[in-house]
Regions:
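Non-catalytic beta/alpha edge segments that cap or flank active sites
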Residues: 1-178
Length: 178
């Protein structure tokens, strides 16, 4: 290969995580957020993080969508995890808020989360969790319960580091890494 004919992207050593808990009661101070810190702890246990920041907001698409856009496109977070708003309650609108801004869906993550959840409980079938990219950020929506957060993250964390590397331009062949 001649010099200058190939651009190699360095593999990242650490990732920036933002987590967002959607809860009307939590945002009003009527409930302690347990899912948000759990998202951070579970992710930190499997991925090297250089920065993490958490948010508690009401179940409101007009609050969620601009926050995710700012975190991804304005501040350059690598990974955004949300908890809550993926069910069928009237104010569960997380998928509707985020699907219009996703550039690419990540159906493999969605399917892995659903499969893992259904293995534990049949009520997981009502989850509408989605995953996608926005710029160089992976955005994943998770159900609101601590149990579902851990189960869903356990299903996708083994592939998440590789997905982030690829999204950031890692040119190595999949399955042939040193």
């Amino acid at each position: 290969i001649e010099a200058g004919t190939r651009t190699l992207a360095a593999r990242r050593e650490h990732w920036a995580l933002a987590w967002i808990t959607l809860s009307d009661k939590g945002a009003a101070g009527l409930r302690v957020d347990e899912s948000g810190p759990l998202m951070a702890a579970d992710t930190r246990a499997k991925l090297p993080l250089c920065h993490e920041q958490g948010f508690m907001i009401p179940d409101d698409p007009q609050t969620l969508r601009p926050l995710v856009m700012e975190l991804a496109l304005g501040q350059g977070y690598d990974l955004i995890l949300t908890s809550g708003g993926t069910g069928l309650a009237p104010r569960d609108t997380t998928p509707e808020a985020l699907l219009p801004i996703f550039e690419r869906r990540l159906p493999g993550f969605e399917q892995a989360m659903m499969q893992a959840s259904l293995a534990k409980t049949p009520t997981a079938a009502i989850s509408r969790a989605v995953a996608g990219t926005l710029g160089r950020t992976i955005v994943i929506t998770l159900p609101g319960s601590r149990k579902a957060v851990s189960e869903n993250l356990a299903a996708i964390l083994p592939a998440l580091g590789h997905a982030l590397e690829k999204l950031h331009g890692d040119p190595s062949d999949c399955g042939k890494r040193a």
